[in-house]
Curated annotation (Swiss-Prot):
Tissue/organ expression: Expressed by the skin glands.
GO molecular function, one term: toxin activity
UniProt-recorded name of the protein: Des-Arg9-[Ala1,Thr6]-bradykinin
Lineage: Eukaryota, Metazoa, Chordata, Craniata, Vertebrata
Family: Belongs to the bradykinin-related peptide family.
Subcellular location: Secreted
GO BP of this protein: defense response; vasodilation
């Protein structure tokens, strides 16, 4: 995942 990506 790219930096700053936060899955929920």
């Amino acid at each position: 995942a790219p930096p700053g990506f936060t899955p929920f």
